[in-house]
């Protein structure tokens, strides 16, 4: 599915938006998180938090390019989790 259509699904508040995002970019998000965290469970949690972050952010914005916007959310979440783990 095209990114514009996925963004449209987020604007419509359709749960299909998350499924389409996961289908198209889920592996990319996991790789971003796992390269930082090196822990499958924490990486999966970051990916799920990315979907929540997108769900909350998109009605206010129409990001372009979508993959970079979403990937940055994943990166920020993974870095935050890494800092938290390192501080403990």
Residue ranges and their predicted role:
Residues 11-12, 48-66, 84-86:
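Sigma70-family region 2
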Residues 11-20, 30-49:
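Short, charged helix-capping/linker segments at alpha-helix termini
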Residues 21, 25, 29, 50, ...:
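Residue-level preference for hydrophobic side chains embedded in well-ordered alpha helices
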């Amino acid at each position: 599915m095209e990114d514009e259509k996925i963004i449209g699904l987020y604007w419509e508040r359709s749960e299909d938006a998350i499924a389409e995002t996961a289908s198209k970019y889920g592996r990319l998000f996991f790789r971003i998180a796992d390269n930082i965290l090196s822990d499958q469970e924490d990486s999966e949690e970051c990916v799920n938090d990315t979907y929540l972050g997108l769900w909350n952010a998109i009605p206010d914005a129409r990001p372009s390019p979508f993959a970079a916007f979403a990937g940055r959310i994943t990166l920020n979440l993974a870095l935050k989790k890494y800092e938290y783990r390192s501080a403990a």
